[in-house]
A protein has these predicted regions:
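Conserved active-site-proximal phosphate/metal-binding subdomains
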Residues: 141, 149-167, 173-324
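Active-site entrance/lid segments in N-terminal catalytic domains of soluble metabolic enzymes
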Residues: 1-165
Length: 324
C-alpha cells in the first residue's frame, strides 16, 4: 500500500527518508533506515571533496540500497557535488537559489537531483530546473531553517504548483503524520528528530534524553546558534532548554570540545555543532536541534522498529479513512 512515486523513483520500499543530519546520521543509522526499507541521507557541510569521498565510500560499503547526499548551498563546492553524484542515488540542495546548472551536473553524473524548498516560488523554480523530486520543509522541522511557512499549507500549495514527487518534512514522527502527508498527495516524508533518539544515531546520550523529555512548546525557532556559520544561514529550531543553558555561559566560554577524527575542536557559545558521543563539556548548552515532533518522541528505540511501527500505523490509518 505504501509504494509511491518516491519509492519507485529512488528504489526503496517505504516512503520514509532519513534527514541529512551530518555527524548524527552515522553509517549505522543510515544502514538501519535502509534495512527497514527507507532511504538514508547524509551531509557534510564544509568538508572537502576528498573527505566526502572517503566518507561516502565507507557508507556505500555498509549501507545496502539507495542513499543520498545533501549540499548546503553556502558551502557549495562543485567537486563535492561531483563526488557525491558519482556515489549516491540522490543529491539534493538546500538554502540557496535554485540553479539549473547544478541539476544538470548531478544528472550528468547519473544521480537524481532534488531541492529542499520552503516556498511555492522555489518549488516552481526547482521543478522548472529539472529536479526529479522536491522536499517541502515547514518551520516545524528541527535544525537550520530557510523560510517561514508551516508544513501543511505550504505542502498543499506546492502540490498544486508542481508535477514532480514531493517529500514532506517538518514535524512528522509517527504513522499518522506519514498517512496525513500521503493523503494530502505527498510521495513520502523526511524525518530527522525521531531518528536522533535511536541507539544507532551519533547523538550524545544527553541529547537523546533531552528529546525524549521534550513536550509541546519545548522547541523554539531562534537565530542564536549561528556562531562560525555563514551569515546567510540565520534561523534554526532547537530545544528551548539549549538556548536557556547557553545564555547562562560567559560570552567567551568554550561550550564543549568535540573529537572529529584526529582533531579536537572547541565549540564556542552558541556554536553550530550538535553534541555527538565524542563531545565533552556543557552538553545541555550545545545546539540541540529538534523539531516540534520532539513532543511525540517518548522512547529511545532502534530505527528499524520505528519505521516498522510507522508503516503499520500509516497503513492502518489510511485503511480507516479510506476503506476498500
Amino acid at each position: 500500500m505504501l509504494h509511491t512515486a518516491f519509492t519507485d523513483l529512488v528504489g526503496c520500499d517505504v516512503p520514509i527518508q532519513l534527514a541529512p543530519m551530518g555527524t548524527i546520521a552515522t553509517p549505522e543509522l543510515m544502514a538501519a533506515v535502509n534495512r527497514a526499507g527507507g532511504m538514508a541521507m547524509t551531509g557534510m557541510p564544509g568538508a572537502p571533496a576528498a573527505v566526502v569521498a572517503e566518507a561516502l565510500d565507507a557508507v556505500g560499503a555498509s549501507v545496502a540500497g539507495a542513499f543520498g547526499f545533501n549540499v548546503v548551498m553556502p558551502f557549495l563546492d562543485l567537486e563535492v557535488v561531483d563526488t557525491a553524484a558519482a556515489r549516491c542515488r540522490v543529491v539534493d540542495f538546500y538554502h540557496g537559489a535554485v540553479a539549473t546548472s547544478l541539476v544538470e551536473r548531478v544528472h550528468a553524473a547519473g544521480a537524481l537531483a532534488g531541492w529542499q524548498v520552503c516556498s511555492v516560488n522555489d518549488a516552481r523554480a526547482a521543478a522548472d530546473a529539472g529536479c526529479d523530486l522536491l522536499v517541502v520543509r515547514g518551520t516545524e522541522g528541527g535544525g537550520r531553517m530557510h523560510g517561514g511557512q508551516s508544513l501543511w499549507p505550504l505542502l498543499t500549495a506546492v502540490l498544486d504548483a508542481v508535477d514532480v514527487p514531493v517529500v514532506a518534512a517538518g514535524g512528522i514522527a509517527d504513522g499518522r503524520g506519514l498517512a496525513a502527508a500521503l493523503a494530502a498527495g505527498a510521495a513520502g516524508v523526511r524525518m530527522g528528530t525521531r531518528f536522533v533518539a535511536t541507539p544507532e544515531s551519533g547523538a550524545h546520550p544527553e541529547y537523546k534524553d533531552a528529546i525524549v523529555r521534550a513536550g509541546a512548546g519545548d522547541t523554539v525557532l531562534t537565530d542564536e546558534f549561528r556562531v562560525e556559520w555563514p551569515d546567510s544561514i540565520v534561523s534554526s529550531r532547537v530545544l528551548r532548554s539549549a538556548v536557556e543553558h547557553a545564555a547562562e555561559l560567559p560570552d567567551d566560554a568554550v561550550t564543549a570540545r568535540v573529537a572529529m577524527g584526529p582533531m579536537t575542536i572547541d565549540v564556542p557559545k552558541f556554536g553550530v555543532v550538535p553534541p555527538t558521543t565524542a563531545a565533552e563539556g556543557h552538553i545541555a548548552a550545545m545546539a540541540l536541534y529538534a523539531g516540534e515532533s520532539a513532543a511525540l518522541v517518548d522512547l529511545i528505540e532502534p530505527a528499524e522498529d520505528i519505521i516498522a511501527r510507522i508503516v503499520r500505523q500509516a497503513e492502518g490509518q489510511l485503511r480507516s479513512v479510506m476503506p476498500s
